[in-house]
UniProtKB/Swiss-Prot annotation:
Descriptive protein name: Magnetosome protein MamM
Region (C-terminal domain (CTD)): 211-318
SUBUNIT field: Forms homodimers via its C-terminal domain (CTD) in the presence of metal cations. Interacts with MamB via their CTD.
Record-listed Fe cation 2 binding positions: 264
Positions of Fe cation 3 binding: 289
Species the sequence originates in: Paramagnetospirillum magneticum (strain ATCC 700264 / AMB-1) (Magnetospirillum magneticum)
Length: 318
């Protein structure tokens, strides 16, 4: 990580999020009940969602940080994707119920009420807190590349937007004499929660499928390797995400006149260069093949996973 404080933040963000969102959830539920706001009650679900997500961060980061062992040669990084999927499924179910309830209230004019102004102030407090938590969790997510902390940042962004909508709804209900706005905002919030749950679910699904590192990452690895003295281009590269980390192996071209020791030294230099430039490389195995000068063939890429033996070999070499 770039700064020493990043490690502290990555370890504490789950507990901070858990405390903050518990307070916000209680405040929103209490104010929504006494203030008569369906939108604020729906907004409390955002904080409940975030509270559970923060709990998943605490559990997930603890498990995923465990070292490799014989039974888990790829590490424990996938646990974060599993927990993200659990959170998304739970809230898709809960918000489906809330969606039906919001529609019923919106269609029944006898249930339309103008909420108390205390709801407006609670919504503004929620906006401020969630904006601060969004930037905090986004910073940690960038540094750690953790999928569950990325989910946490997305949730805080959505919460700030939802609380802002609640505030606008209260203003409209009070000053424009439109009490139906409050249940309408509640309806919008439940739809937004459903869509957010779908995004989180699909992100977790892709993570569990060990997707390729992507063209941009592959090109960075190739570019870095080819800048190392003695490298006559990258012949083959295989890179994919395992959890939040990248596992890769590559074949580089070297002068046919080089000795085995010289080729090995070049491979080690490539490892050091790539791992030094790219922060999320967990494992990189580099081997060399003879390549004639002037051979400008482009590298080939593979998305097939590494075998168990290759994984253990790369951990020894890296």
């Amino acid at each position: 990580m770039r700064k020493s404080g990043c490690t502290v933040c990555s370890r504490s963000i789950g507990w901070v999020g858990l405390a903050v969102n518990t307070v916000l959830m209680v405040m929103k539920a209490f104010v929504g009940l006494i203030g008569g706001s369906q939108a604020m009650l729906a907004d409390a679900m955002y904080s409940l969602k975030d509270m559970l997500n923060a709990l998943m961060v605490v559990i997930g980061t603890t498990i995923s940080s465990k070292p490799l062992d014989a039974e888990h040669p790829y590490g424990h990084g996938k646990v974060e994707f599993i927990l993200s999927m659990v959170v998304s499924v739970v809230f898709i179910g809960l918000t489906g119920y809330l969606l039906v309830h919001a529609v019923q209230i919106l269609l029944d004019e006898s249930m339309h009420r103008t909420p108390h102004l205390i709801v407006l102030w609670a919504a503004l407090v929620s906006v401020g807190v969630n904006v601060a938590m969004y930037f905090y969790s986004r910073c940690v997510a960038i540094e750690t590349n953790s999928p569950i902390i990325k989910t946490m940042a997305k949730h805080h962004h959505g919460d700030a937007t939802a609380s802002g909508a609640v505030a606008l709804g209260i203003i409209g209900a009070h000053y424009l004499n439109m009490p139906w706005i409050d249940p309408a905002v509640a309806l919008w919030e439940t739809i937004d929660l459903l869509l957010l749950g779908k995004v989180v679910f699909m992100d977790a699904y892709r993570g569990l499928m060990d997707h390729t590192a992507g063209e941009a990452v592959q090109n960075r690895i190739v570019d870095t390797a080819e800048r190392v003295p003695g490298v006559r281009g990258v012949i083959h590269l295989r890179a994919r995400y395992v959890g939040q980390d990248i596992w890769a192996d590559m074949i580089i071209g070297v002068d046919p006149e080089h000795t085995v020791e010289q080729a090995h030294d070049i491979c080690e230099a490539v490892q050091a260069a790539v791992c030094g430039k790219m922060r999320r490389i967990e494992s990189l195995h580099v081997s060399a093949e003879a390549r004639e000068a002037g051979d400008t063939s482009k590298p080939t890429f593979s998305e097939e996973p590494l075998t168990y033996d290759e994984v253990m070999l790369s951990k020894v070499d890296n």
